[in-house]
From Swiss-Prot:
Compartments where found: Periplasm
Species classification: Bacteria, Pseudomonadati, Pseudomonadota, Alphaproteobacteria, Hyphomicrobiales
GO MF annotation, one: metal ion binding
Name of the protein in question: High-affinity zinc uptake system protein ZnuA
Region of interest (Disordered), residue spans: 120-147
Gene that this polypeptide is encoded by: znuA
Principal location listed in the UniProt entry: periplasm
Amino acid sequence: MKNLHSLFLASAFLAGFCGSSLAGEREGVVVSIKPLHSIVSAVMQGVGKPKLIVQGAGSEHVYSLKPSDAEAIEHAKVIFWAGPSMETFLDKPIDTLGEGAKVVALGDAKGLTKLKFREGGPFEAHDHGHGGSHEEEHDAHGSGDHDHAAEVAEEGHEHHHHGEYDLHFWLDPQNGKILAADIAKTLGESDPEHAAQYEKNAKAYGEKLDALTREVAAELKPVKDKPFIVFHDAYQYFENRFGMKAAGSITVSPEKAPGAARIQQIHDKIKSLGATCVFSEPQFEPKLVKTVVDGTKARTGVLDPLGAELKDGPDLYPQLIRNLANSLKDCLPK
């Protein structure tokens, strides 16, 4: 069985170098993470369903590619992802297994609101890399055999660099509207027969997101100026859209544990600002958050930038935005 598994991985890996001539005609749509998959799903309603790579409570920061993921990338006609600075695990596989596919980095979509990384003071300076060595990441994935596709993904992981812009752009629902239109255009070019349907779906989804933006803005109005601390600095697009303001983040990268000095700095920040809530994330161990709030009056809450516990599909993205608003509203004092 193990030999068959190895044979499959070797075949998939080699197929990437040989191109689509060996893989056959490409078909299907692959999307990296749940929020983007949700938007693509909405645009594709009535036509088809895209394949999701990072499923469940997985995080793009520490994900290892599975054989089924490698196969999907190998045969995909269109691949959507945020971009190489976000899903570093996909960079190498897309270059090899995805050769011949239409690859779209949605972080490059025209018209997006784009925000630079926050650095200094309460926001730990970015090293413009995901941080951590290859060995540390391997430990984060857990013990056990590493498949070849995962090794391809990790080969360039520690060498990849952030750009100057924060790539959590989907947390602004108005960016979600722009993404839907961009996705519809790409799909229409690859599948002209259904171009009108994609465009219609994107327009309807955009109107839904306009209504959502108004709804969330009204809900958050009572807590707009209340300081809070986040696990890692992923939410400034949401904050910028709705007038919220995080007072700081515990760590710059979820896979990189902060030192004692950093924890003490945030602890002092909570006390000096009177921050009433510190938010963890469902994808990561909340122990750090508990350590930070120990000895303060701050409560803990959960913010989920990916929709870890939400059902995949077109409704995930609007619900993700609502859940962020609800978590903030429930934890912060009115």
